[in-house]
């Protein structure tokens, strides 16, 4: 669950971009809690937070997932993703991204540092540093969600390129129409997207709240046509710089 749940949470994009039009240039800051199901069983919760830093104009996206029940024995620690990024001239630029997972069956962590002056990234895994080139507008798994929320104020993006420990990934999006969802927050009008990676059997359906800054309120992940992971929003709080 660990990798499927957060790597692909909103998972995860350059053709239509992290460059946002001027009338959509405010980044929502918030905290959302999601209930997580795996193969139709409740397995934990995930907390997504986007905050603005006090010290500079950067923002921080963080995602924390905790297992419950019997899975707590296998995944006793919190799975954490953190992305610090800048947002200037309507462009999102990741600065540093980290992923940490320590479970009984798997222990993995890595860090990606972005050098936009040289268009390079340094990926650190187990004290080994790998440098590689990146294209403009490349995102990470955290800034992907932020870019998607901003772009959806205008239209459905065609694709995004993200960088993770496996290199560059391109995800494509298609509209699946609109749907009203019943949630703990009430009935929410959503736009429904399909996310796919070419050549892979994974698919993700995302419901984005039209009147809540396009925050995702439901995510379903499929593998080989079978539903695997479902995230449903449970609570939402808008944040200020003092929170």
Range-by-range predicted roles:
Residues 16-19:
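N-terminal signal peptide c-region/cleavage motif recognized by signal peptidases
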Residues 103-147:
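Hydrophobic, well-structured mid-protein blocks that either form specific transmembrane helices
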Residues 1-9:
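Bacterial N-terminal signal peptides that target proteins for export
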Residues 22-116, 152-243:
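Acidic, serine/threonine-rich low-complexity disordered tracts
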Residues 2-3, 127, 131, 159:
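Intrinsically disordered, low-complexity regions
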